[in-house]
Amino acid sequence: MLAWQDGGAKAAPSHHKISFSVLDILDPQKFTRAALPAVRPAPREARKSLAEVEAGKDASSRDPVRQLETPDAAGPGAGQASPLEGSEAEEEEDAEDPRRPRLRERAARLLPGLARSPDAPAGALASGEPCEDGGGGPVRSPPGSPGSPRPRRRRLEPNCAKPRRARTAFTYEQLVALENKFRATRYLSVCERLNLALSLSLTETQVKIWFQNRRTKWKKQNPGADGAAQVGGGAPQPGAAGGGGGGGSGGSPGPPGTGALHFQTFPSYSAANVLFPSAASFPLTAAAPGSPFAPFLGPSYLTPFYAPRL
């Protein structure tokens, strides 16, 4: 009797077959068996795949597909011993295995989001989809990676600066006319600039910029000449214009015959004359008998206005 039991105990491991193929290791069907008693470790713990270990121990509780496959694992008999491999119960489980892929496919169709989530790597492997957090699965590049198109746009942004203004190509006739005008005067008035632009078929801005550049070039070629010209060519003093008609050497030239018309002469602008103008300096007084305004204005009317007041 003891010999028969020893022989049966020794013959039992002969039915145990270990498969080292990748499909058998990654097959989720072999992860659903309950734990054996202390005689040997549970097949589920012994045959865990690398993807399930990385996913974590709580993947089985979050995966609805695995809960459908193992309704007896959460039942009251979960702690009981599972039948030995090679027994009739195991053969019945192997006979029912072809139905489980259909259940998994059906569950994957009903719950596509959970099947594709990284919390269910076993269901993703069973349905043939690549696992994102697995070791060999393809990993999607983040949006900020160098391969994405957004960094390319950012690289092109510094190059997309404000376009530079095109330089004006002046013709030979335009350059000659501009040079002749610059020799005549280095600063143009508004009317001169407008007339010159219309005559040369240019805009006022083009003429103004050309004169600015030409003045800058001239100042570099003749340093200090512009300041000396301004000091030497100052305007004459207004007080030097009095006296002998319009032909004086120090005054501004006047029209011919101004000496005969005494009412066109201008007095000197001194402080006393501005504050207290004298009646003799104005030709409109009644003392001048040859004045054209004498018949219209009497002496009693003009004298109080032009008499000095203290």
Swiss-Prot record:
Has UniProt tagged this entry with the keyword Nucleus? yes
Q: Which GO terms describe its molecular function?
A: DNA-binding transcription factor activity, RNA polymerase II-specific; RNA polymerase II cis-regulatory region sequence-specific DNA binding
Instruction: Specify residue ranges for compositional bias: Acidic residues.
Output: 87-96
- Which residue ranges have biased composition labelled Low complexity? 109-118
Q: Which PROSITE patterns match?
A: HOMEOBOX_1 (PS00027), HOMEOBOX_2 (PS50071)
Per the record, its GO cellular-component terms are: chromatin; nucleus
Q: Where is this region: Disordered?
A: 36-165, 217-260
> What are the Gly residues biased-composition ranges?
230-252
Example GO biological process: cell differentiation
Residue ranges, compositional bias (Pro residues)? 140-149
Keyword terms, alphabetized: Developmental protein, DNA-binding, Homeobox, Nucleus
The UniProt record lists the keyword Nucleus: yes
Localization? Nucleus; Nucleus, Nucleolus
Q: Which residues bind DNA?
A: 163-222
The protein's matches in Pfam families, at most eight in alphabetical order, are given as:
Homeodomain
Q: Where is the composition biased (Basic and acidic residues)?
A: 42-66, 97-108
Main function: Transcriptional repressor. May play a role in early development as a Wnt/beta-catenin effector, hence controlling pluripotency and preimplantation development of embryonic stem cells. May promote adipogenesis in mesenchymal stem cells, possibly by inhibiting the expression of the antiadipogenic factor NR2F2. May inhibit osteoblastogenic differentiation.
Q: Which family does it belong to?
A: Belongs to the NK-1 homeobox family.
Question: Assembly state and interactors?
Answer: Interacts (via the homeodomain) with HIPK1, HIPK2, and HIPK3.
Q: What is this protein called?
A: NK1 transcription factor-related protein 2
Organism placement in taxonomy: Eukaryota, Metazoa, Chordata, Craniata, Vertebrata
Q: Which gene encodes it?
A: NKX1-2
